[in-house]
Amino acid sequence: MRVTRNVRIMAGAPLAAAALIALGAGDASAAIPVNKPMSGKATYYNDAGFGACGTQINAGNQMLVAVSHAWWTTANPNNDPLCKGISVKVTYQGKTITVPVRDKCPSCANTHLDLSQPAFARLAPLGQGVINGLTWQFVKTGFAGETVPISEPIVGSTIG
């Protein structure tokens, strides 16, 4: 390829990107199904650093959950509705925990949760590695972390 052709292609790239963003930002939206029980599985992780919500996390010693990339609806995950007071209530063999969404699991299917190590340990021994057959649901939590029942879905827009 010649340099002049590359320059012309690159000059048009910002316009093409803007058009794609405008098309993607249209009617595309996804609702977080708050208070809708789902069946699935859980694994655990113990990474530390910045979570998808833009805050420092330590999955080795904090109670939190990473949910599937499929539930995230904004280009900037820091602004995603999942980071605005959404938790996951998980029940397995008579034990229930409620943990805040703080991270994204890029390899998880939409019914697969990646719990922090201490959250997983409250439900099953770490040596088990995977919990199959659990039930879980998104819940809205208040400022003090308490679960607040709501019936309306929380909606966010998607790009692409």
Question: Model-flagged regions — what are they?
Answer:
Residues 2-14, 19-160:
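Secreted/periplasmic proteins
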